[in-house]
Curated annotation (Swiss-Prot):
Species per Swiss-Prot/TrEMBL record: Influenza B virus (strain B/Hong Kong/22/1989)
SS bond list: none
More about this protein: Major glycoprotein, comprises over 80% of the envelope proteins present in virus particle. The extent of infection into host organism is determined by HA. Influenza viruses bud from the apical surface of polarized epithelial cells (e.g. bronchial epithelial cells) into lumen of lungs and are therefore usually pneumotropic. The reason is that HA is cleaved by tryptase clara which is restricted to lungs. However, HAs of H5 and H7 pantropic avian viruses subtypes can be cleaved by furin and subtilisin-type enzymes, allowing the virus to grow in other organs than lungs.
Record's protein name: Hemagglutinin
Role of this protein: Binds to sialic acid-containing receptors on the cell surface, bringing about the attachment of the virus particle to the cell. Plays a major role in the determination of host range restriction and virulence. Class I viral fusion protein. Responsible for penetration of the virus into the cell cytoplasm by mediating the fusion of the membrane of the endocytosed virus particle with the endosomal membrane. Low pH in endosomes induce an irreversible conformational change in HA2, releasing the fusion hydrophobic peptide. Several trimers are required to form a competent fusion pore.
Statement: the UniProt record of this protein carries the keyword Signal: yes
PTM notes: In natural infection, inactive HA is matured into HA1 and HA2 outside the cell by one or more trypsin-like, arginine-specific endoprotease secreted by the bronchial epithelial cells. One identified protease that may be involved in this process is secreted in lungs by club cells.
Keywords: Disulfide bond, Fusion of virus membrane with host endosomal membrane, Fusion of virus membrane with host membrane, Glycoprotein, Hemagglutinin, Host cell membrane, Host membrane, Host-virus interaction, Lipoprotein, Membrane, Palmitate, Signal, Transmembrane, Viral attachment to host cell, Viral envelope protein, Viral penetration into host cytoplasm, Virion, Virus entry into host cell
Location(s) in or outside the cell: Virion membrane; Host apical cell membrane
Family: Belongs to the influenza viruses hemagglutinin family.
Amino acid sequence: MKAIIVLLMVVTSNADRICTGITSSNSPHVVKTATQGEVNVTGVIPLTTTPTKSHFANLKGTKTRGKLCPNCLNCTDLDVALARPMCVGTTPSAKASILHEVRPVTSGCFPIMHDRTKIRQLPNLLRGYENIRLSTQNVINAERAPGGPYRLGTSGSCPNVTSRDGFFATMAWAVPRDNKTATNPLTVEVPYICTKGEDQITVWGFHSDSKTQMKNLYGDSNPQKFTSSANGVTTHYVSQIGGFPNQTEDGGLPQSGRIVVDYMVQKPGKTGTIVYQRGVLLPQKVWCASGRSKVIKGSLPLIGEADCLHEKYGGLNKSKPYYTGEHAKAIGNCPIWVKTPLKLANGTKYRPPAKLLKER
């Protein structure tokens, strides 16, 4: 049997031959790399967002405190901190707190000389604790304190629940009953009465007025000296006599005098002392505070929930791991601030289409 051999001859024509390579569409994405500088890539994932200002919110999964006492209507946080009548109520616990009051912080009842002490800081001090409660008992018997007996002064601008004249529950205005004479400095010890190992915040102060009023109330029109000491911190004051313009608080009667209010922090089991002369505001109910609450500057009301609270932008939900814009304090599950936008390259390095090569 004969084999038939077919010879095939491949002839190359003069037609062009096309060589292909890696191709991709033109890419608008540029990323900066550590080794090659700016590089075009076929795809990127944005890692940053630029927030816009929004309402502050409750922090997701965390109790957030706005006002110290949400149910105390028409009360500033300083009213609550000093336990002004009609401003005493439940102070809920919180892991995060909004510092929402701006200067000047005022309180009713009686004109306060805010700038003489650190009293403006008291609401923020309380806000920094997770749990705060006002004691049910008084820390000392003010009527029988050294230099007494005293009657407890009240203010017509400070009505209580029965619409009678009242005063702050944290202090007793000690006015001598029948011994209206000058006195040398007297000392009262302030015991620790909190029951759960909390910090005890004890509020106290003194009253100053015109010479005539000081003489009528206390039997002494000279400047009076006061000192508080607790937890290794000692503070001294000398009262100012006269020079106060009449001032009205919350539609009450015009007041010719002023009160200076301060506080001291007593650690568990530690006794504080107050050295005083006439016009003292002796401590009564105290704040018992424990735990820590993160504090951030913000505004009320708190609307909805957010992953993060940011001082400049309010409530943020974390849609990207980083953000650009204004850098400020933030708490919660927050994106990280970066100066310029970040991108993650999720494609390949861009290569231009291969050129057509001709062979003759």
